[in-house]
A protein has these predicted regions:
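N-terminal small-domain helix-loop-helix segment of the aminotransferase-like
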Residues: 2-86, 259, 361, 368
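Active-site phosphate-binding strand-loop segment of PLP-dependent enzymes
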Residues: 126-191
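Helix C-cap/helix->beta junction micro-motif
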Residues: 115, 175-176, 286, 320, ...
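A short helix->loop->beta-strand "cap" motif at the edges of active sites that frequently abuts
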Residues: 96, 117, 175-178, 203
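PLP-dependent enzyme catalytic core of the Aspartate aminotransferase-like
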Residues: 315-324, 330-368
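Conserved glycine-rich beta-strand-loop-beta hairpin in the small C-terminal domain of fold type I
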Residues: 255, 271-280, 290-303
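PLP-dependent aminotransferase-like
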Residues: 7, 90-150
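Conserved core segment of the aminotransferase class I/II
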Residues: 203-273, 280-281, 352, 363
Length: 368
C-alpha cells in the first residue's frame, strides 16, 4: 500500500501514548483528572443528541462569558489540537510561509506541515527568559509569511509572553499581511497574574485553548478557537469536513462545568501551588540541573548539566518506575520536561526518584 507524503505522524504523541505511562508519571503536562461524580449533574438530565450545528447556543453563551469575548468570535472544537488545526487551515494555503517558535509543542509543527505550510523557525532562548526575540522575528519575516505560531504559556518552559510583546509581534505580522496564532492551553495556570486571552489585543491574532490541561477535564474535549468574526465563520464551515457536530452529552457536561467553575479552578490552583513549592525545593537542591524558579504553569524544562537526558530517562523508567519527557521532542536534547499536575504524593516521590537517577548517571557517566 502506498501512502501520500502528506501522511504525517507525531513522534511525540506516539511516545506519550505508548511510553509515558509509569507509576510515577512526571511526563503528563496537565492537572490530574476532575471526577465526574463531583460535577452537579444527574444522568437523567443528560441527552445524547441536541441542536449542535454551528455551536450549541447555551454553550456558546457560557464560553463567551467565560472568555470575555463575543460569541461570534468563538468556535467550539474538539480540544486544542483540533482548534489548532482549524486555525491553521483557515489561514494557510499549501506552500504558504509559516514561522513557528523553537522549542515548541511538536504537533504545532506537524499540523502546519500536514497542511502544506513551508515551516521556518525562530528561537525562544533560555537566556532571554524563553521569550521571543522581536528583532530576530523581524529579520525572519518575509513578504510571503502568512502565519506566526506561538504558545503562551510556553510549552515546554511555561514562560509567559507579556501583552506588550504580543502586540508588537501582531503589529510586525500585520505589516506583511500575516496572522499570529497563540496556543493558550496552559495560560490559565498563571492564576495570580490574571490570565487574559491575547485575542483581545489585535484583530490578526487567533487564539486556541481548552479546558484540558489546567483543569483536568480532558474527557470533555472542550476546545475553542477565537478569531475575528470572518475567521470564526470560516472555521465553523471548515469543521463540517472534520467534526460535523460534537458529542452533545459532552456539551451538556461542559455547560455544567462552566456554570459551576469556581471549585474546579480553585482545586487546580491549590494543587499547583503546593506542587510548585515541591518542584522549586527540588530544583534548588540540584546543582546538576539548570532551571529558573517555577512561578506559574504546569511544566518546567530544566537543562541537564552533565550526562545525557536519554540515559537519565532510561534509568528513571528502568529502575524507578518514573517518567519525564525527553527534550528531543522539543528539539532540545539537553533538556527534559517535568509536569507538576499529578497528585502531590506522586510528585514528591517522583522527584525523589528523579534525584536518585540523576545521582546514578552522575556517578556512572550515563552508563546503565
Amino acid at each position: 500500500m502506498t501512502f501520500s507524503k502528506r501522511l504525517i505522524e507525531s513522534p511525540y504523541m506516539y511516545w506519550a501514548k505508548t511510553q509515558q505511562a509509569a507509576r510515577f508519571n512526571l511526563g503528563n503536562s496537565g492537572v490530574l483528572p476532575y471526577l465526574l461524580r463531583d460535577l452537579p449533574v444527574r444522568l437523567e438530565d443528560l441527552e445524547l443528541s441536541g441542536p449542535s450545528f454551528y455551536g450549541w447556543p447555551p454553550l456558546q453563551a457560557a464560553l463567551a462569558h467565560h472568555l470575555g469575548m463575543p460569541e461570534e468570535r468563538i468556535v467550539h472544537a474538539v480540544g486544542t489540537s483540533m482548534s489548532n488545526h482549524l486555525a491553521m487551515a483557515v489561514i494557510l494555503d499549501p506552500g504558504d510561509d509559516v514561522l513557528i517558535e523553537r522549542p515548541t509543542y511538536e504537533l504545532l509543527i506537524s499540523t502546519a506541515e500536514y497542511l502544506g505550510g513551508r515551516v521556518r523557525r525562530f528561537n525562544r532562548r533560555p537566556e532571554n527568559g524563553w521569550l521571543p526575540d522581536l528583532a530576530e522575528l523581524k529579520r525572519q519575516l518575509r513578504p510571503e509569511t502568512r502565519l506566526i505560531v506561538l504558545s503562551n504559556l510556553h510549552n515546554p518552559s511555561s514562560a509567559r509572553i507579556p501583552d506588550a510583546l504580543l502586540k508588537d509581534i501582531a503589529s510586525l505580522a500585520d505589516n506583511v499581511g500575516a496572522s499570529v496564532l497563540v496556543d493558550e492551553v496552559y495560560l490559565d495556570a498563571a492564576f495570580a497574574e490574571g490570565p487574559k486571552t491575547a485575542a483581545r489585543l489585535a484583530d490578526n491574532i487567533l487564539v486556541t485553548s481548552s479546558l484540558t490541561k489546567v483543569y483536568g477535564l480532558a474527557g470533555l474535549r472542550c476546545g475553542w478557537m477565537i478569531g475575528n468574526p470572518e475567521a470564526a465563520r470560516r472555521a465553523w464551515r471548515l469543521n463540517d469536513l472534520f467534526g460535523v457536530i460534537p458529542a452533545h452529552t459532552a456539551e451538556q457536561l461542559t455547560l455544567a462545568v462552566l456554570t459551576n467553575f469556581a471549585p474546579i479552578r480553585d482545586r487546580a490552583q491549590r494543587l499547583l501551588t503546593v506542587n510548585r513549592e515541591l518542584l522549586n525545593q527540588f530544583l534548588k537542591s540540584r546543582s546538576d540541573l539548570e532551571c529558573p524558579p517555577h512561578t506559574h504553569g504546569t511544566v518546567a524544562f530544566p537543562r541537564l548539566r552533565h550526562g545525557t537526558v536519554e540515559s537519565l530517562c532510561e534509568h528513571l523508567r528502568k529502575h524507578h518506575e518514573a517518567t519525564v519527557v525527553p527534550g528531543r521532542f522539543f528539539e532540545m536534547p539537553l533538556h527534559f520536561r517535568i509536569g507538576i499536575g499529578c497528585p502531590t504524593a506522586v510528585l514528591a516521590e517522583g522527584l525523589n526518584r528523579l534525584g536518585q537517577s540523576l545521582d546514578a548517571i552522575g556517578v556512572t557517566g550515563g552508563a546503565d
